[in-house]
Design a protein with these regions (language model features):
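N-terminal Rossmann-like NAD(P)+-binding subdomain of aldehyde/semialdehyde dehydrogenases
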Residues: 1-120
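Conserved small-residue-rich beta-alpha loop and adjacent elements
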Residues: 104-170
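Single conserved hydrophobic/aromatic residue that forms the stacking wall/gate
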Residues: 192-200
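Predominant activation on well-ordered alpha-helical scaffold segments within soluble catalytic domains
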Residues: 32, 47-50, 87, 91, ...
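Active-site-adjacent beta-strand anchor residues
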Residues: 39, 155, 182-183
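Short acidic/polar active-site loop segments enriched in Thr and Asp
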Residues: 42, 150, 178
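A glycine-rich helix N-cap at a beta->alpha junction
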Residues: 171-187
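Positions that flank functional sites
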Residues: 53, 159-160, 187
């Protein structure tokens, strides 16, 4: 094992990195209530959360494919170029991390090895609010794509008019995400762990 000695200043950084985050109890309780409500009441609870927290009434959670396909129309070419560059660089970085399957046969016929298999699906969450986070789309989705995950699902909150942030949506379209849900918060994260919601 390699031993690395840290200077006193570096130790302060290490202590910060190793610090366990503690959420305030009221936040934990609120998230727990949302989870219990969605598990018990499904889509109705998700709609209620979207209305309470995001101020939007949604009839359908899943974004229609035609809206995804049209996401790049009218965007500043400089933004699209920057997006393509960022996605390319992040892809190149994560390609170096990809583990390969390997097998070997011993003289006695025993086969040894490691089979690396991607997950069947990955869910990513892109925060909303007053700012747009297209970088969150790339940073979360591209590693899964490089790993060979065949299905990537994205959730992001809609604005009060029911629309998604155009930059976030365009980024998802550009890198190839085709399954997108308009919802935020803890209720959105439940999308990845339960059959609700699955509307078209």
């Amino acid at each position: 094992m390699k031993t690395i000695k840290l200077a006193p200043g570096e130790r302060l950084v290490t202590n910060q990195l190793n610090r366990k985050g503690v959420l305030p109890q009221n936040i934990v309780d609120a998230a727990r209530d949302i989870v219990a409500n969605v598990r018990a009441n499904g889509d109705a609870a998700v709609r209620d959360c979207c209305q309470r927290f995001d101020g939007v009434e949604l009839q359908s959670f899943r974004l229609p494919q035609e809206q995804i396909d049209a996401a790049l129309e009218g965007l500043d070419p400089a933004f699209v170029a920057a997006l393509e560059k960022a996605a390319r660089q992040i892809r190149e970085f994560h390609q170096r991390e990809v583990e390969q399957s390997w097998f070997t046969t011993r003289p006695d016929g025993t086969i040894l090895g490691v089979k690396v298999t991607p997950l069947a699906a990955a869910g990513i969450y892109v925060p909303g609010g007053t700012a747009a986070y297209p970088s969150s789309v790339i940073m979360n989705a591209v590693p899964a794509m490089v790993a060979g995950v065949p299905r990537i699902v994205m959730a992001a909150p809609a604005s009060r008019d029911g629309r998604m942030n155009p930059y976030v949506l365009a980024t998802a379209r550009k890198i190839g995400i085709t399954e997108i849900y308009k919802m935020g918060g803890a209720q959105a994260c439940l999308l990845y762990t339960s059959p609700s919601p699955r509307d078209g």
